[in-house]
Amino acid sequence: MRLRTRKASQQSNPIHAQRAQRAKRKHSEVEESLPVGGGKPQKNETGLLSSIKKFIKGSTPKEERENPAKRSRIERDIDNNLITSTPQTGEKPNKQISRVRRKGQVNGEAGSYEMTNQHVKQNGKLEDNPATGSPPRTTLLGTIFSPVFNFFSPANKNGTSGSDSPGQAVEAEEIVKQLDMEQVDEITTSTATSTNGAAYTSQAVQVRSTVNNGLEEVEETNDRDLPPLTAPVSPDSGYSSAHAEATYEEDWEVFDPYYFIKHVPPLTEEQLNRKPALPLKTRSTPEFSLVLDLDETLVHCSLNELEDAALTFPVLFQDVIYQVYVRLRPFFREFLERMSQIYEIILFTASKKVYADKLLNILDPKKQLVRHRLFREHCVCVQGNYIKDLNILGRDLSKTIIIDNSPQAFAYQLSNGIPIESWFMDKNDNELLKLIPFLEKLVELNEDVRPHIRDRFRLHDLLPPD
């Protein structure tokens, strides 16, 4: 009788099979628990303790993955255009540094610039790099100075005051300065852009500027990349292109400051209730206040190089340094020294603070001549025009006088205003000296200055009839 036997490997023992499966499962779990960087294997815990640990620690790796990696410095620089004048296009930011770096600035000379997104022409001007995705920076030349007043036509004379719409202001003088600036090789410029970021095409632009009361006329025709003077310019706008042989009477009709004053809208309730910008008077403060304009009244400044400039200084504006050249009106210092003895001198300009404040720091560093300074932000904006409302001074208007080469500037207090001829370069000018006797007499009388100013200059007689 033959017995059949099986080999040990072929015997099916259920106990051994279960043990083998358990060993294989534990081996795979140990491999899964091994850390990525090596190290001891972690035991795969089960039960209540394991559930608690998973509940506490389970969401941590997910949060770490959701947190983005820190941005590099180059990537952070992409967001710098949020604080510049460059219009936003809505496209993905270009990962290229668009930054202006100033190098050493010595003795008031403008330093050189490094602009990674612009090419430098042979004449020293900057040309936007077409390879970059960001639109060119908006040109802001001339905006630091006092703007030219917008023509107040019958079509818009009923506009409300305080409508801050600088886009409606026809700053013809500033456009002329832009044309002059682009002819100077040493000064950096950039292409003007529209509000949607598209650059204006180069076209022949004829600009005629009748500055203030028609005393100076500038006419230039040039091929330049310039924005339109206004959007749009009405046919009867005073600063549209005019014939070169226009007479003085025609120029006066182009922009009559007294027509502007006649139709200026009244101040709003909010403007009437503005808090005074000046501190209260002290015992040493003179009783009478004299408000002085800056540009073309005391000085004449230009971004073009002036050979007879009394001083020059750099101004940093919108990441670009502009060199400002200054002429001082004859008897400028003598006038201020005498008037500061009997008047509280207040400088009130429609220019930017970044320019005017720096100029005053040079002319009057110890504030011995000018006690207070007010700038464009203290003006009232009416239809894009900046008007100096004397109520913001917080002073007695019966003892307050303003001297300005633009009568429109004191449109709300015409009886307090003394007009003065605009000054640019006449070395024989003595208008400041001629005003000293009258100003000294007003203090001696110790009366309301307004009737005396009205009788002397008779500005109300120049207003057009109703």
UniProtKB/Swiss-Prot annotation:
What Gene3D superfamilies does the record point to? HAD superfamily/HAD-like (3.40.50.1000)
Stored SUPFAM superfamilies: HAD-like
Please indicate if the UniProt record lists Zinc as a keyword: no
- Name the residue ranges with Basic and acidic residues bias: 60-79
Q: Which residues form the FCP1 homology domain?
A: 283-442
Q: Which residues form the signal peptide?
A: none
Describe the family membership recorded for this protein in Swiss-Prot or TrEMBL.
Answer: Belongs to the CTDSPL2 family.
Highest lineage ranks of the organism?
Answer: Eukaryota, Metazoa, Chordata, Craniata, Vertebrata
Residue segments, region Disordered: 1-137, 216-240
Q: Does the keyword Hydrolase apply?
A: yes
SMART domains per the record?
CPDc
GO MF, one example: phosphoprotein phosphatase activity
Q: Which organism is it from?
A: Gallus gallus (Chicken)
Q: Identify the keywords attached in UniProt to this record, alphabetized.
A: Hydrolase, Protein phosphatase
What are the EC numbers? 3.1.3.-
Q: Which domain of life is it from?
A: Eukaryota
Q: Where is the composition biased (Polar residues)?
A: 81-97
Record-given protein name: CTD small phosphatase-like protein 2
What job does the chain carry out? Probable phosphatase.
